[in-house]
Amino acid sequence: MVPQAAKAAGRHDPEKVVAVVHALAARFGNRLVTARAVREQHANTTTWIENQPPDAVVFPQSTADVQDVVRICAAHRVPVIPFGTGTSLEGHINAPFGGVSIDFRDMNRVLAVHAEDLDCVVEPGVTRKALNEHLRDSGLFFPIDPGADASLGGMAATRCSGTNAVRYGTMKDNVLALEVVLANGELMTTARRAKKTSAGYDLTRLIVGSEGTLGVITSLTLKLSGIPEEISSGVCPFPSVEACCNAAILTIQSGIPVARIELLDALQIKASNAYSKLTLPEVPMLFLEFHGSKESVAEQSKRFGEIARELGGGPFDWATKAEDRTRLWQARHDAYWAGRSLRHGSQAVATDVCVPISRLAECVVQTQADVAASRLVAPIIGHVGDGNFHLTLLVDMADRDEIARAKALCERLAERAIAMDGTCTGEHGVGQGKMKYLDAELGEAALSAMRAIKQALDPDGIMNPGKIVA
């Protein structure tokens, strides 16, 4: 079957691309760039997926600018690829059919904060760190924390989550409404600011996770949370990865409202010690954080400690000072870069899956054995409170046999998760890298429904083609 996206002109009709570039240059002047170095920066560079740069990059400053870009591209059937900060991991920002990358660097304003309603309105180029800095004196924060300082538009587009998801949910739980430019240049508002609605189809949830394939997000209304009265963090060693996972499972099943519970295997601890200047014992660890009142945090910590001791874990090492907590969680967020330091010159390829919490230990243990049997270097980390974990494969890209073994390992991991009634991607998204698993995970009826939605909203296939469905 020829992908629907192939109907888009892109590289298939250079004359149309030239016409689009001329029209955009007339409209945007030096905010349109065609230099090869800039175009290559706007394509995938962090996995083994081929770098596929766009034909041009444009830097809009308003929703009206985005509408003009889309209308010009639509008139010539040239693809449009949204770009936030480029931290996605499955080829989302690649341009397999050429086209125009829309970089939201200059749409980075916090438009409104409604502290009394616990929400805010932002442009898509605002990063999570920038938003929380803006909110610093309000007593509020935005809790979704994927590690990378990603743009909020990109976080919504991939339906990402992060270390706080076990307590605060994922992006789908924290986006109240969106403004979206559709493939014909029209502006759609998906909802109002009310915390709940029964008014028609849930268009917000449809767009969140659509990876730019249905429209271009130009503003987001986000749910905010109050900064907890008390925050307590710490690390707890365990004799095995299985014991770590079982502790996480029992913590969740016991109803302890942990804010973060993160797994790092012994290899990842070794890497983090070296990279982040920590001195942790090189054994499997859980990094934890508890939020609430002083009394509730103390109670949560006590209950977790009892679970840990039953499984041979401990002692629990508290990070009581704010600077120690920051250092600890920065080390967790730097795990990708720390992992890369284990094997200099290698390419780090990250992949993730998510399984029902009751199958977590089984899936992680089987994956750890698979890594060893594959003769690969691949630390395991994970947001294990909701059954989500990651592999960071360190691959010699000049070794074809090693590349083949790594790809086979990733395929087995996705298949293993799906067989356990899980998903091939908990938070990285589908992009180009995981399209092939959707049939096994969702079935042909679901894929046909997705294609019908895509056809209805993007009949010419110009919106980030070659991603999610073909």
Residue ranges of predicted features:
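N-terminal flexible segment immediately upstream of the FAD-binding catalytic core
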Residues: 1-71, 87-118, 268-276, 322-350, ...
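Activity-critical C-terminal alpha-helical subdomain
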Residues: 186, 435-470
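C-terminal substrate-recognition/cap domain of FAD-linked oxidoreductases
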Residues: 34-42, 225-226, 232-412, 416, ...
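Alpha-helix capping/hinge segments and adjacent helical runs
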Residues: 30, 418-430, 459-463
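FAD-binding subdomain of flavoenzyme oxidoreductases
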Residues: 109-262
